[in-house]
Amino acid sequence: MDHSEVKFTNKTHDNILKMELYGHRNDLANAFLELQKNEEFIISFSKDTHIEITTKPISKGYTLEYVCKNIFQENIENVMAVGDSENDISMLSLVGYSYAMANSNKYVKIFAKYHTSAFDQEGVVMAIKDFLYRKSQK
């Protein structure tokens, strides 16, 4: 079976919220460009070998905003988010305290207000400590 073949369809199913494609980034590049033509989806590289496809408006940012507003009644400006992939951009661009991991690509880092170490270097722990410090200074 040839795993590099990708077939596209305009058929959608109302219950599908998320799909993922895995492969080499070069192999996925054509699929990425083709999928971006469909305005019903949010398409992003999650990792170099992984494309995430979600139905609009579903995204990490949308979900975080919904949870803050409807469950915790918290202003999103008071919330932190840590991310390292393109599928984190929607979340990083919404919160008041956004952290990009050191292993993030340059594009993701543009959307973060702050930066932290890589995941395997306790970057999440460092981001939480920084967030708590910044909140204590207000």
For each feature predicted by the language model, list its residue ranges.
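Conserved acidic, metal-coordinating active-site core of Asp-based
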Residues: 1-91
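Mg2+-dependent phosphoryl-transfer enzymes with acidic/Ser/Thr/Gly-rich catalytic loops
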Residues: 52-138
